[in-house]
């Protein structure tokens, strides 16, 4: 049976009940004195992997499969989540890309490119929509939570692919459909998303995976001298690089021709109350919610590397954005990002 993105290693479980107490959706049960994940209830937020004192809650490896893809396909691009700027802060862009290319990747592209197209399409969608509450599809944990635990709000999720999937579609359109795309970021739930869209993203790995991979291959990014080709392809992202911080999506949502009330909230503990309380305003306004499961945004994802404060991480993201103006972007109007979300049948 295929492993889910998060699973239990029974031999390591000491029956301490910490994950049972900490799980925000009560998706863990005890069997034979071991704590197992209830797959039908899990939203893959990764909190259990952070609180387990013995490492019994494991994150599924993606590096082994990625190696096979690199060995068998000539063109493989790494889609790098925008929080890289606060996770590898001691490296230049060129050094990080050079290190990734040493692993065998053809090139490195910013997931934020996909985020920018998502923002544009969401803006258009909101302009044409009736008053109501609309929720971003960018965070896969939030999407899973709503589909399982707030099913009546599933129709409120904007019917757009996430930035990761949008980016993969852009890359395949630009370089050809035979291109293979691997994603790297701080989010465990992206592994689930990749499982559901295998035609777009082959594998999702974490920043921890990437760092460990460098170490195993004896690659020291900080010692590398970048070559001329060690830059982001096919172009560098602009405003999309703000996506990993709370509120980072909102600047890209156009509310000029039609008034859109834009708000951002993070932390799962807030999500349910936010949605429920704003229901009372759905007849009056067009309300767009950027909801992120991790406190402070993706910069605080469960598979993050850096333990730096959220304030410093946010600062680093904003500094990176300020240092890199908008690129000239080709017309992407022909790329379809629409999708549908259905509530799970949890009966």
Locations of regions flagged by a protein language model:
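Iron-sulfur cluster-binding cysteine motifs and their immediate structural context
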Residues: 2-9, 14-39, 43, 47-63, ...
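Iron-sulfur-associated redox domains of electron-transfer enzymes in respiratory
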Residues: 60-347
């Amino acid at each position: 049976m295929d492993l889910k993105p998060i699973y239990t290693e029974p031999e390591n479980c000491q029956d301490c009940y910490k994950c049972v107490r900490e799980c925000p959706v009560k998706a863990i049960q005890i069997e034979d004195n071991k704590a197992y994940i209830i797959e039908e209830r899990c939203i893959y937020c990764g909190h259990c992997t952070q609180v387990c004192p013995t490492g019994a809650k494991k994150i599924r490896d993606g590096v082994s499969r990625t190696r096979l893809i690199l060995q068998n396909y000539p063109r493989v691009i790494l889609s790098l989540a925008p929080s890289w700027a606060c996770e590898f802060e001691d490296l230049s862009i060129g050094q990080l890309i050079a290190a990734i290319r040493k692993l065998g990747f053809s090139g490195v592209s910013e997931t934020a490119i996909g985020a920018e197209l998502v923002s544009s399409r969401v803006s258009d969608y909101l302009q044409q929509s009736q008053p109501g509450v609309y929720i971003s599809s960018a965070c896969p944990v939030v999407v899973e939570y709503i589909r399982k635990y707030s099913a009546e709000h599933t129709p409120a999720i904007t019917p757009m692919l996430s930035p990761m999937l949008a980016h993969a579609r852009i890359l395949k359109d630009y370089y050809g459909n035979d291109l293979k795309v691997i994603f790297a970021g701080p989010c465990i739930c992206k592994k689930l998303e990749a499982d559901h869209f295998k035609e777009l993203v082959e594998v999702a790995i974490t920043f921890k995976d990437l760092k460990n991979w460098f170490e195993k291959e004896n690659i020291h990014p900080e010692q590398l001298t970048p070559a001329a080709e060690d830059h982001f392809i096919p172009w560098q992202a602009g405003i999309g690089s703000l996506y990993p911080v709370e509120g980072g999506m909102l600047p890209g949502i156009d509310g000029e021709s039609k008034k859109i009330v834009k708000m951002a909230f993070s932390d799962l503990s807030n999500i349910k109350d936010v949605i429920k309380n704003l229901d009372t305003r759905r007849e009056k306004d067009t309300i767009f919610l950027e909801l992120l499961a991790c406190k402070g945004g993706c910069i605080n994802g469960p598979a993050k590397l850096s333990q730096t404060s959220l304030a410093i991480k946010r600062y680093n993201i904003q500094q990176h954005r300020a240092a890199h103006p908008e690129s000239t972007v080709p017309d992407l109007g022909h790329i379809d990002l629409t999708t549908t979300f259905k509530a799970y049948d949890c009966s």
